Swiss-Prot record:
It is found in: Cytoplasm. NCBIfam families: aroB (TIGR01357). Zn(2+) binds at E184, H247, H264. This is 3-dehydroquinate synthase. The gene is aroB. CDD domains: DHQS. Keywords: Amino-acid biosynthesis, Aromatic amino acid biosynthesis, Cobalt, Cytoplasm, Lyase, Metal-binding, NAD, Nucleotide-binding, Zinc. SUPFAM superfamilies: Dehydroquinate synthase-like (SSF56796). The keyword Nucleotide-binding applies. GO terms for cellular component: cytoplasm. It comes from Bacillus thuringiensis subsp. konkukian (strain 97-27).
Length: 363
């Protein structure tokens, strides 16, 4: 098992990673001061059916534990479910000493975290991720819900008390969720750990390799990349934006195709390839785009759909949170491990995206 210490300006906490991590949950709760009055577990239907009782049983405490379960899927990260969770919290008499446990993937972590951030102006919460993708979202304190006009547009910065990454929970994931989460692992390697990138190319030949000790190794290498960036810039005023590598186009694809019709990781994978494609043009460097594309395709990541309107995608990219006064800002790569936020004119993005779309179709 590997423990990772997270330090930000507002809070310090630990991430417990391993096959026995759930055993720490009771101690985490018992050590909280002031003492926890009661616990609300927020989960989704798919995860709750598999793991909710396991977590309840692991909480060997006297306090009342109850659950709030929403349907599964990114579209459920909505104001309606956010409001309903508050109603449930009030009905079950949560107070300022209560604790919320986010049991699920990134959608649940975002939803439950924002409920915790806003209920009575902020109460404590613990992340219990059940997906590989959540190795990214569970750490760092960004919590949010979606708006019909944009992803993660309503939210806050609210750090958890701890993250309990019980790796056996991941074994029930379908392949598309392994692939989705692995995209964020690749992202962390490309922007902050070149040694990890080379290790992935050698050791992860198929998604089936993301198991057991290799999985724990990946998590204990990828999470510190994010932790180091968050320690420098907790509220995304500077270098934390580097974590959005691949996300400008990725989020646009999610919005255009409809949340749930493409996984977050698949969108980010296409977005990273486009960022590398554009970076080669902007910086006049060779980043081995063609080799990278074949590596991504080996894992089953999609190509950019040929029937999507480039003009519409550019419009959606202008709504990205990094955009400033309607100008697209993208995270581009100078070399592996070195990225920057760059202002890109609409016309440049449009021309590059058309060429990228054509390249993905023809090759």
């Amino acid at each position: 098992m590997g423990n990772i210490h997270i330090q930000t300006k507002s809070k310090e906490y630990d991430v417990y990673v391993g096959k026995e991590s759930l055993s720490h949950l009771t101690t985490i709760v018992q050590n909280m001061q002031p003492a926890v009055s009661n616990i609300m577990i927020i989960s989704d239907e798919a995860v709750a059916s598999l793991h909710l009782q396991t977590v309840v049983d692991a909480l060997q405490i006297d306090q009342k534990v109850f659950s709030f379960v929403v349907p599964s899927g990114e579209k459920e990260k909505s104001f309606e479910n956010f409001y309903a969770a508050h109603t449930s919290a009030l009905e079950n008499k949560l107070d300022r000493n209560s604790l919320i446990v986010a049991l699920g993937g990134g959608m649940i972590g975002d939803l439950a975290g924002f409920v915790a951030a806003s209920f009575m102006r902020g109460i404590r919460f613990v992340q219990v991720p059940t997906t590989l993708l959540a190795h990214d979202s569970a750490v760092g304190g960004k919590v949010a819900i979606n708006h019909p006009l944009g992803k993660n547009m309503i939210g806050a910065f609210h750090q958890p008390e701890a993250v309990v990454y019980h790796t056996p929970f991941l074994q029930s994931l379908p392949e598309k969720e392994w692939r989705s989460g692995y995209a964020e692992v690749i992202k962390h390697a490309l922007i902050g750990d070149v040694k990890l990138y080379h290790w992935l190319k050698e050791e992860v030949q198929t998604l089936a390799d993301l198991r057991d000790e290799k999985l724990i190794h990946i998590l204990t290498k990828a999470i510190p990349v994010k932790a180091n960036i968050v320690a420098q810039d907790e509220t995304e005023k500077g270098v934390r934006a580097h974590l959005n590598f691949g996300h400008t186009l990725g989020h646009a694809l999610e919005k255009e195709l409809g949340y749930g019709n493409i996984t977050h990781g698949d969108g980010v994978a296409v977005g990273m390839l486009f960022a590398i494609f554009l970076s080669e043009q902007v910086y006049k460097v060779n980043l081995a785009y063609e080799e990278m594309k074949q590596w991504f395709l080996k894992y089953g990541y999609p190509k950019m759909p040929s029937d999507l309107s480039v003009e519409r995608l550019v419009g959606l990219m202008k709504q990205d949170k990094k955009a400033n006064a309607g100008t697209i800002h993208m995270v581009l790569m100078q070399e592996y491990g070195v990225v920057n936020v760059v202002s890109i004119p609409d016309e440049t993005v449009h021309i590059a995206l058309e060429a990228f779309q054509k390249d993905m179709v023809e090759k």
